[in-house]
């Protein structure tokens, strides 16, 4: 399985968004995620305008629309009505729309149907910035998102210890046999960075990389992530070997920066 690389753009206005898109495009991602919650005054006209211009810039690169709410680590809180409105509008020009299904269960079915009707696929997402839920909770969350109609199910968690990362990677590897849709999983922060690389263990179909800026703690720079993922084509690495490889690579880059 080839892991796709997705790079976020987080401009605070149209000009910043489009400028970041041009820069990120040079990093050759498979997908580009527009984090629309960074724009303060967002409405359907703004979304239609920016998504159309983004598609013109990025060409064949897949576009993911995300409005990350404050409840799940984003910049803004909005009503269910507005959330549904902007997600459905974005679906007209985007390939994927991120939906925080667990936080919008009352509207999830209709929202997902509307997004698909407008031509986009749905990434059901759930984020835990304070902890790593139990294995049972993680599996239950992912199954519920699939049941609601997600085409891809994504979960991000925060570890408190190395054991949390190892446990999360283990349950992630089980999810590929439990769900019937692709998964995206990540353990965040410095501790969890290895999970973004060990995708042959986690079965994560996409890894998010830092472009102009990082959109979540622990994101690896796009060029480093690509090199590390490429190595796995030639070596079958276990968890400890992959972690050691990542640490050595970062140490080498740190030494190079000190010499420059």
Predicted regions and their residues:
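Active-site-adjacent beta->alpha loops and helix N-cap segments on the catalytic face
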Residues: 39-54, 101-117, 133-136, 160-175
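Catalytic beta/alpha-barrel core
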Residues: 10, 31-41, 94-106, 123-132, ...
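Short, acidic/polar
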Residues: 12-25, 78-89, 134-144, 194
């Amino acid at each position: 399985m080839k892991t796709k690389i997705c790079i976020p753009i987080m401009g605070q206005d149209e000009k910043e968004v489009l400028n970041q898109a041009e820069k990120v495009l040079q990093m050759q991602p498979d997908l580009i995620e527009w984090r629309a919650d960074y724009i303060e005054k967002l409405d359907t006209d703004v979304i239609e305008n920016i998504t159309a211009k983004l598609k013109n810039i990025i060409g064949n690169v897949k576009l993911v629309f995300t409005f990350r709410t404050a409840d799940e680590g984003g910049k803004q809180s909005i009503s269910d009505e507005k959330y549904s409105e902007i997600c459905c509008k974005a679906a007209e020009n985007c390939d994927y729309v991120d939906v925080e299904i667990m936080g919008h269960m009352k509207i999830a079915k209709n929202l997902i149907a509307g997004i698909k009707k407008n031509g986009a696929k749905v990434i059901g997402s759930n984020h835990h910035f304070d902890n790593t839920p139990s294995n049972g909770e993680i599996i239950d969350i992912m199954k519920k998102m699939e049941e609601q109609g997600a085409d891809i199910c994504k979960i991000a968690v925060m570890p408190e210890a190395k054991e949390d990362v190892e446990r999360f990677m283990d349950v992630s590897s089980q999810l590929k046999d439990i769900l019937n849709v692709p998964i995206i999983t990540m353990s965040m922060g410095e501790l969890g960075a290895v999970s973004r690389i060990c995708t042959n263990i986690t079965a994560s179909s996409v890894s998010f990389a830092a472009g102009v800026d990082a959109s979540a703690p622990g994101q690896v720079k796009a060029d480093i992530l690509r090199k590390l993922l490429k190595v796995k084509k030639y070596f079958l690495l276990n968890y400890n070997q992959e972690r050691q490889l990542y640490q050595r690579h970062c140490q080498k880059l740190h030494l190079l920066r000190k010499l420059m």
